[in-house]
Structures are given as C-alpha cells and as structure tokens.
Amino acid sequence: MSNNYTSLSSSLDEEMGLKAGHEIDLEGSPPSEHNSEEKSTLPSNSDILTSANPVSQASETPDHSIESNTGSTQSPTSHSLLLKFSFCIVYYFYFAIVVLGCVLPFEHTHTFLIAFLVIFGIISVILFSGSIYYYETWTKTVKHFLKKVISPFKKEYIVCAFLKTFVFYGLLKTIEHFLVLLSGDKWGWKCSTLSSILTPVSCISFCLNESVQLRSCSTHLFINTVAWIKSLGGGKNAFENNYNQLNETSPEDLV
C-alpha cells in the first residue's frame, strides 16, 4: 500500500516561515545592543533620589545668610533704642537749663559767660545726637513732608502743625506777659529768648510729627470738626456754596 501522505503546509507557507524567521533573527540581535546602550545612559539611583528630594538636602545644609541677617537686625534695634534714650535725656536737660537760665538773674558777666558756654555745649550735643538719630530716617521724613505739602488732599496735616505752633507760641507769650507784670522788665528778654528758641524747635517737631505719624489726635479732631461744620451746613455742596458767597461779598457788605 503506497503512502499517499501530503503535508498540509504549502510552498507558500514555507516561504512565509523563512521570511518570518529571517525577520526574527534580524530583530533579535540589535535589541540587545540597544538595551545595553540604554542601560548605560540611564541615571543612577542616587541621581534620581537627589532630583526627587531637593528640599531635604537643602534643609540639612545650614543657611549662614539667614543667621547673618538675624544678627544684623538685632543690633540696630538696640542701637536705635540707645540713641532715642540719649536724645530724650539731652533734650529734657537742655529744656531745664533754659528754664533755669530764664529764672536765675545773671548779675555778673562771668556767670553769664559760663551759662552761655554751657547752653552752647548742650545745643551742640543736641545737634550731634539729632543728626545721628535722624541719619537713617531723614530722607523718608523729608519725602513724607514734601508729599504732605505738595498734595492738595493732605494739607490739613501741615495746617494742624502750624496751628499747634501758633497755640504754643501764644501760650509762651501769655506766660511772658504775666511774668513781666508780676516781676518787672527783667523777665522780658529772658522770656522772649525762651520763646524765640522754643518756637522754631516746636514748629519743626510738630511738622515732622504730622508728616511721619499720620492722623494724630489733634489732626483727627480738626478733620472731625471740619466734617461736623460741613454736616451743619447741609453737606459738602452747601458748605462750598456758603464759602463761595463769602468770598464774593465785599468787606463793606459785611459791615
């Protein structure tokens, strides 16, 4: 009996199998080389950890700049407190010397010369300490003061400063008048000297206070008084109308 067995795979299938095997062999060898190259180019585990947690290493390293900044901020505060304390002591001591100079009569020339030298020395110390005290803040003070003068909406601060100076000068002149009436003319030049010294100092102090420390108690009182006057006049428009009418009227009509 003859064997009539025939394979189910045709010649076309064999050719396809050869082609498939050839492609597999060609694709098999390059991936190993490619994978080896990729393994060499991949970052190590330590690099991955450092890139994933940069904050932990930064927190471990001490920051010397922060320590230096904290140290620099602590020293100027104590220095400024010392300057303020010394400035206040010198200022009040100078005020006491001026008052004693007005009270004590100077009959001898040597006493007057000694008192003049003492007062001159105290004034020099005050100017020196004041220049040191305002060394860091005088630019800000001048800038704020110029803004208050130039700005048309904030001139009430400067008005309040000059009103304070005027009231202070009037108080000094009243005291001078009563002292002259009680004790004679010998108090005249002393009190006038005191008022001439304290008036510019008070004017500068009030202006600086109103320009740096905005809206003090007296400024609030002034603004509230103006607002109350406007409310009594029926609002802002009525107040402006009354003000314009007063400006248009002549002095003869007012009499």
Swiss-Prot record:
Residue ranges annotated as transmembrane are 85-105, 112-132, 162-182
Q: Which UniProt keywords apply?
A: Membrane, Transmembrane, Transmembrane helix
Give the membrane topology, semicolon-separated if more than one. Multi-pass membrane protein
Q: What's the superkingdom here?
A: Eukaryota
UniProt xrefs under InterPro entries? WTF (IPR004982)
Its Gene Ontology cellular component terms are: cytoplasm; membrane
Start and end residues of each stretch annotated as Disordered:
19-78
A GO biological process held by the record: meiotic drive
Where do Polar residues bias regions lie?
41-60, 67-78
Q: Where in the cell is it found?
A: Spore membrane
Protein task: May act in meiotic drive.
Q: Which family does it belong to?
A: Belongs to the WTF family.
What is the protein name given in its UniProt record?
Wtf element wtf15
Q: Species name for this entry?
A: Schizosaccharomyces kambucha (Fission yeast)
From the UniProt record, report the name of the gene that encodes this protein. wtf15
